[in-house]
Design a protein with these regions (language model features):
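Short beta-strand element of the alpha/beta-hydrolase
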Residues: 126-128, 134-144, 488-497
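Bacterial N-terminal signal peptides
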Residues: 7-16
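Short amphipathic alpha-helix adjacent to the substrate-entry channel of hydrolases
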Residues: 153-170, 503-519
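Alpha-helical scaffolding within the catalytic cores
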Residues: 244, 282-298, 331, 662-667
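Gly/Ser-rich "nucleophile elbow"/oxyanion-hole loop immediately N-terminal to the catalytic nucleophile
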Residues: 131-134, 187-239, 256, 537-609
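Primarily recognizes the serine-hydrolase "nucleophile elbow" in alpha/beta-hydrolase
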Residues: 218-288, 589-661
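Alpha/beta-hydrolase
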Residues: 140-143, 172-174, 262, 495-496, ...
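Alpha/beta-hydrolase-fold serine-hydrolase catalytic core, especially in secreted/extracellular enzymes
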Residues: 21-121, 300, 307-492, 498-516, ...
Length: 690
């Protein structure tokens, strides 16, 4: 009784003495920096660089050909088409004729529409000679991040000049381009075909990269089946995102004889060095377990020309940075087959990120050479066709990436929770093991707690640490308690989506109640995030300069914060899950706190959906570690991510592959028992927020 009275006296004394100044005092303590974004980014880069999938040793031609075949199958089945219905993968091409544009200049344009998956159509344009006999080589041209134009001028120039050299050219309209541009800001969920919306497909258990791959492969299927096309002389090319489509398809589908990707894909090491090279989310399918160096090696011995800019105003992945990984390391694979002359690298001397005349002429030369056509050095002038003429009829209820993801989520059915106690215990244990597998949980203990700052004044004691875990990654933490509080009892771990510096008012309220607190910034939150304050973009000077150069660059970069890019790399090449890493840090920090202090019970207090879900995962993995979880500003279901929607830029760790397919929050609550959950009113959808 005397202990309780003393505690109450100390708490009252601190509260009364500090009064209105308490929040400011706590705010100053919580704003004490523990690590700069550059430090966090360095740790992540080191962590990832140690996990870049190794490029296989070439060996001999027969062995490498067999290895290449096996790797293609594994990449398609285990990663790209993960969760896909077999009927969607194997369905034949479904193209419809939408009319012919007769130019009267020796070529015509056949307008087409085609179905990617049931209910999801896009357009295509086949350039072909007006009169032709026999079979000719054909090239599929992939569009980059173009958005507005139905068919970019540079692709029209390419197509006409390919035809005048004796080739057919099929242009495929990409997601969020041309008639698939769904309006709104390019990188917001209101624009339902924005590529980052593919993250909802991953969350629902169906690889988004499979959608992009299938859209590309359907074009190849169509070309290969045309009676006037030579199936042994098929090519692929594209700029930027079109280059990514070129390498992913041509590496994994051996029907592509010759390929010319232009400025748009990079080795993982390059992506880690300069995170502007990571690409959009489709570039990084979860559990890919292969580097783009391997995809380039899978092209051997087929003819391949890599084109990059010596300088590039849009990408930091320029020729000097990409050549060592994607050309120099790959040349030995061509040497196996004595086909070194089939593998070329061209550095465009002009500072452009375009399929400009320099790059187009290189592609004309390369395809003509390897398709056995006479060389033509000059480019032919082209009349550009306008969007109105190129328009095709697409279904009024055509699917979008976001709507497809929502449809997939709506079809998810999970195992019911058993009603009898014995079966329920078995179910709980089984689901906990499944959770460990889905979030790829690996225990992490604190290797060293680096003391950063401390204070003891105004009736408050505080100690701030950088918690270094055994895997080399860090969290930031501040321990607070009223001066003179009695030993023992419980402590509360406070998590806040925006970082602990935003929790000052709530922390003050808890301290006034006499609570002992550990406020924590887990990986990717607060000052344990690589994102810069005031700008969610990377730290390199060149990227900041790019953002200053024009509005398009700024918009593109702002929506690609390092936290999202590194989350993508962790899932794709490192076979990690950010949510698993964060849950492991929370469990590790809790264990460290119990070991270093006299507390005998731990609670968690969260604000925001990110902190809520990470805490629920941690409690479900270690149900005996925490007594109570108090949730503020959270949600009742992960379906909220789809319906609101919440973007991957807002909550990168929540978009882990299969997470929603296997679990919702009601199941996590049961698995976390005996941890008690106390949840206040859920957060309203951000779209309706005032």
């Amino acid at each position: 009784m005397r202990r309780r009275a003393l505690t109450a006296i100390f708490v009252f004394a601190w509260s009364a003495a500090a009064g209105a100044q308490t929040v400011q005092q706590v705010q100053e303590i919580l704003e004490e920096p523990t690590q700069a974004p550059e430090v966090v980014e360095y740790q992540l880069r080191q962590y990832l660089m140690n996990r870049v999938p190794a490029l296989p040793t070439p060996g001999d031609p027969k062995r490498w050909s067999q290895t290449a075949h096996e790797r293609r199958q594994r990449l398609l089945e285990d990663s790209i088409f993960h969760g896909w219905p077999r009927s969607w993968i194997d369905s034949p091409p479904n193209f419809t004729d939408q009319g012919i544009i007769v130019t009267g200049k020796g070529y015509q344009i056949q307008k087409l529409s085609y179905e990617i998956v049931p209910g999801f159509w896009t357009s295509a344009f086949l350039y072909e000679p007006e009169h032709m006999t026999g079979r000719a080589p054909a090239i599929v041209i992939f569009e980059g991040h173009n958005q507005r134009a139905f068919l970019p001028e540079e692709q029209q120039r390419l197509s006409v000049n390919y035809v005048r050299r004796g080739m057919l050219a099929l242009n495929l309209v990409w997601f969020n381009c041309g008639q698939l541009f769904t309006g709104g800001e390019p990188y917001t969920p209101e624009n339902e075909n924005a590529h980052w919306n593919g993250s909802y497909m991953n969350l629902a258990g169906t690889s988004a990269t499979g959608l992009f791959y299938l859209a590309a492969r359907k074009g190849l299927d169509y070309l290969a089946g045309l009676p006037n096309v030579d199936p042994h002389r098929l090519g692929a090319t594209g700029l930027s995102g079109g280059a990514w489509q070129t390498i992913i398809l041509s590496a994994l589908d051996e029907r592509v004889t010759a390929a010319v990707p232009v400025s748009g894909y990079f080795a993982f090491a390059s992506a880690i060095e300069r995170n502007g090279d990571v690409g959009d989310m489709e570039y990084n399918p979860p559990d890919f377990d292969a580097d783009y160096t391997l995809l380039t090696a899978l092209r051997a011995p087929r003819p391949t020309l890599l084109i990059y800019g010596s300088e590039d105003p849009f990408y930091v992945g320029r020729a000097p940075f990409t050549k060592p990984y994607l050309y120099d390391q790959i040349l030995p694979f061509y040497h196996l087959y004595h086909k070194e002359d089939f593998f070329e690298f061209h550095a465009n001397p002009h500072p452009v990120h375009r399929y400009d005349e320099e790059n187009r002429k290189e592609s004309y030369r390369f395809f003509s050479q390897h398709f056995g056509l006479p060389p033509v050095s000059e480019e032919i002038a082209v009349d550009v066709i306008n969007d109105q003429t190129l328009s095709v009829n697409l279904p009024t209820d055509n699917l979008t990436i976001l709507r497809l993801a929502r449809n997939l989520a709506d079809k998810i059915k999970r195992e019911a929770v058993p009603s009898d106690a014995s079966s329920r215990d078995q179910w709980t244990q089984s689901r906990r093991q499944k959770l460990e597998h889905v979030v790829l949980y690996h225990p992490q203990h604190v290797k060293h707690a680096w003391g950063v700052a401390n204070s003891k004044n105004g009736g408050l004691e505080a100690e701030t640490y950088r918690l270094e875990f055994v895997n080399g990654l860090s969290a930031s933490a501040t321990w607070l308690q009223p001066t003179g509080v009695q030993p023992g009892g419980s402590a509360t771990i406070v998590l806040q989506d925006e970082g602990r510096s935003h929790a000052a008012q709530h922390v003050t309220d808890l301290l006034r109640r006499g609570e002992k607190l550990l406020t924590v910034d887990l990986l990717f939150t607060g000052d344990a995030s690589p994102d810069r304050k005031g700008s969610p973009r990377a730290n390199e000077h060149v990227l900041i300069k790019m953002a200053e150069e024009n509005e398009h660059n700024r918009e593109w970069l702002v929506n690609r914060p390092p936290s999202v890019l590194y989350t993508q790399l962790l899932e794709s090449m490192a076979r990690e899950r950010s949510i698993g890493l964060e849950a492991a840090q929370l469990i590790g920090a809790a264990s460290w706190l119990k070991d270093r202090s006299d507390v005998n019970e731990l609670n968690i207090d969260t604000y925001g959906i990110r902190s809520q879900v990470v805490a629920m995962v941690a409690a479900a993995l270690k149900p005996d570690l925490f007594r109570q979880l108090t949730i503020r500003g959270g949600t009742n279901s992960l379906k909220y991510l789809f319906s609101c929607p919440i973007t991957i830029q807002e909550a990168p760790e929540l978009f882990s592959r299969d997470f929603y397919k296997e679990f919702d929050l009601d199941q996590l609550k049961i698995i976390a028992s005996p941890t008690r959950l106390d949840q206040s009113e859920p957060r309203p959808c951000r779209i309706t927020d005032p």
